[in-house]
Amino acid sequence: MSFVWFLVGFAAMVVFASFFEWTLHRFVLHRPLWFFRYPFNAHAMVHHRAFRADRTYHVQNRTDEGKIPMNWWNGPALILAGCLPFTGLAAFISWWFLLGAFAAACGYYTTYEYLHWCMHKPQHRLVERSGIFFVLNGHHLLHHRYMHKNFNVVLPLADLCLNTLLVRSKVCFAQARGDHVPDVQPRARSDT
């Protein structure tokens, strides 16, 4: 039974993490909080200024590489914060539930950082050749064009459920190009 609770905790955290990522991204990384401006400054003011939806979506110089990932201490802090609701539930259900949630939270954060790195610094890695990465890269590219849309990087479930999902641009723009970057321009209208 313990392995079942591990799997339930893991699956529940994957879904929860999509909404946690969305909430953090929308309300903390894109809005200055009067008592804690660091996340907004690091993300909206530094990351989004360095990486736009045009050719600058990809690293232009080595100094920009440090503007891709979050600071090292963000990972443990976010993983622990995300696991807090699961800790209370685990006290009543099973500690295996929390262990599964913790494993998923670690995997989700690691996946976030790795995919985000590959999106902004492409090097024809194996993951970059996958169809899932192709779709997620277009999703994230549109976020850099429309910062009020597409808050998820790993699993756009929350974007879908909370009506912030955008699959194509509404207007033409000079978007980033590359082997693993989809065309997110508006579809051409047919005259038929």
Residue ranges and their predicted role:
Residues 17-102, 106-182:
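Membrane-embedded catalytic scaffold of the fatty acid hydroxylase/desaturase
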Residues 1-4:
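Short, strongly hydrophobic alpha-helical membrane anchors
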